[in-house]
């Protein structure tokens, strides 16, 4: 018994209602002895069944324009079917099938090269009608009249998804087979039990009529045996049918059971079994129904900020992979933990069932609200604030999980080195997806302009918050220019701990680059009433973000991706996503209102505090990590490395900073007589650095009230370190005697129009311009350029030495830039639509690595968009930007292409079977 499965556009004609509109449908032609039928599955969720045996009046096939075919089927009751849009092969196969049925010449049609057996299932609704209604029409027994009235069969009474029951397709089939055996052994006993449960009156009538059923037992047994074989075949081939009213997933119970089994095996065990050979076959079915895949997220009430952020996060393959690529048993994680909430949403975010999405989003919102009460109600909130809380809470979640299942070192010591390698089974740790993907490390150098004391502070951040230019410019700024301005040197009102001088110079640089660089534009400013207002100025969205100019020799590249052998099967996740597109009723436990979900498992938070600053390398070998740690760094240049606070101090950033000090210290002169404001007897060679003790205690640095807010320091660390062994390189000690201090430098507020200038403007009045240097990395303020140009004059002999030092420094910086080019590629944008800060709507534009196109996510609405159009439309509304390191981006594309090739090979293999 075979089935023909094809696709076309169908119109149904009726003498009473007329002809319906043309609708796309999947057509299933089922051939059985005297029970041939045609089943139409529509996109709307409905399906229609037409009996063909002894019911066909006429079949006409017409072809026109070469490849367009039109089939007209007329039934005995003058109803008709008009089918078009069929290929020539499909049209001929369907015509042969209908003619054979019309002529009562039953020969199973063969469709070469097609996987028809995969879709040879019939609906349980039809099985119920056949097995429990029509079989007993010949019998005078009224045993199944109740089943006929309710349309519910014995098979439907079997429990489906419960918290304690998880059955695979094979297990369900085995249970059904056992029930059939009991039914065949004693049909009357089965009828008695069934009727006792439903209606005692009918049970008495059935008991009186049992004697009349004996003669039909043999025939019934044969028919039931035939139905059982067909049922087993259907279960083995597709496992996708149910009678829940869902259009194509008719027998959703089997789908539910198999789906939950897969999810439980995937989530609740350390590894999943590879015994599920039917997953690829199930994948084929869902590819026939792409309309059942819904990528949008429902709005729970002013939760567009949450939907936009979640769409951006979950569209990043490396983050999704790291979220699921954990070695600890998922069954031990509380269901209301944020890690589990994100994992479940990652599985079911594409399901067609909106109620499931609402439930998952509500649980996730409760998990966030347990730590941040601002998100508890239905008020409008800021997307960046939600992103910050989400990443921080997820990181804290993983730190406490690492504390619970703390990896043991091979030496049995608690202070095992924090950099744990996944290829060491005894020292494997649980990588945090936030640390491996978003966490970046900045080195903030603050130098006193009076005594030259330098304070080095390491800052760990998950994103960079960047100010927009406050002055209106003729040409719009870009993400690149505002990003470069953030890393430019600037003057700070910072009180020196040594000499109590109030003016310092601060410079930022990268110590470690992230895989994903999140750039947050501060789209707010003060109005005339000193109140915050939204800043909707136009900003050009850069497709590529270059960060090499803000790196140095000690800058570490992003953490490497997991090796192919260690990556969790991301294709499996896609299959499960498609499988869950049906009406799956999964009951999740209520979220527990607690500010610390994992608190009962932890005795003290001291260990988690010690784990701050861990770098866990997941899935990379020792050789790769040594290459990672040693790349672009030399032992002689590395002064010290502190793993506890991630301080990575090199000569390069210090020299960079001191070069800037040498320039700016000579460019300002005293107002009276042009004499220096400070004594020239303070050499740079006496610069002191704060040292870091071996076991530093964390102390919070407190600024005095006289200082302005330093908004550049997003998350300053609690530690200030002293290291008396660190000194300025010798090449700068010669300049120390010529250094003059000043405190009259002005802070330039105006930002560059485009990327920061790479050279000084050509002076028109100075005679000696050949010695004027072009430093590419020293972002000097515009207000100081005129005084800097005075250094080109030979009237001051010390200027030549200073310029020579600056020139040598610029050449060295240029050579360092040539060693490696770090570029980031735009992959997602979160935008705020609205005129005020307290109202509006959030949307998300994200790059789909599987389809390699951009999509706009507006809650439940998902639309494709061109990247250039997106960049143009989001100039005034772009708020949060996600950039992926270009090497990681290319690697992701290669992996996706390989996965698609493997998937295509699997499909071709399955179709040949």
UniProtKB/Swiss-Prot annotation:
Annotated signal sequence is none
Query: Changing residue 799 to S: reported impact?
Result: In SPGFX6; uncertain significance; decreased protein abundance in patient sperm
CDD domains in UniProt = Peptidase_C19, PH_USP37_like
Disordered, as annotated region: 601-636, 753-772
Q: Which residues cross the membrane?
A: none
Q: Which SUPFAM superfamilies match?
A: Cysteine proteinases
Record localization: Nucleus; Cytoplasm, Cytoskeleton, Flagellum axoneme
Q: Where is the composition biased (Basic and acidic residues)?
A: 601-612
Question: Which EC class heads this enzyme's classification?
Answer: hydrolase
**Catalytic residues?**
304, 841
What EC number(s) has UniProt assigned to this enzyme? Answer: 3.4.19.12
Keywords of the record, alphabetical order, are: Cell projection, Cilium, Cytoplasm, Cytoskeleton, Flagellum, Hydrolase, Nucleus, Protease, Thiol protease, Ubl conjugation pathway
- Could you state one GO cellular component term attached to this entry? nucleoplasm
Entry comment describing in which tissues the protein is expressed = Expressed in testis.
Give residue ranges for domain USP: 295-886
UniProt record, GO biological process:
G1/S transition of mitotic cell cycle; negative regulation of proteasomal ubiquitin-dependent protein catabolic process; protein deubiquitination; proteolysis; regulation of androgen receptor signaling pathway; regulation of protein stability; spermatogenesis
Q: Which reaction does it catalyse?
A: Thiol-dependent hydrolysis of ester, thioester, amide, peptide and isopeptide bonds formed by the C-terminal Gly of ubiquitin (a 76-residue protein attached to proteins as an intracellular targeting signal)
Location (main, coarse): nucleus
Superkingdom of origin: Eukaryota
Query: Which disease annotation does the entry carry?
Result: Spermatogenic failure, X-linked, 6: A male infertility disorder due to asthenoteratozoospermia and characterized by reduced progressive sperm motility and morphologic sperm abnormalities, such as thin heads and short or coiled flagella.
Q: How does it assemble?
A: Interacts with RING1.
Concerning its family, UniProt says: Belongs to the peptidase C19 family.
Give the protein name, as stated in the record. Answer: Ubiquitin carboxyl-terminal hydrolase 26
Lineage runs: Eukaryota, Metazoa, Chordata, Craniata, Vertebrata
- In the UniProt record, the gene name given for this protein reads USP26
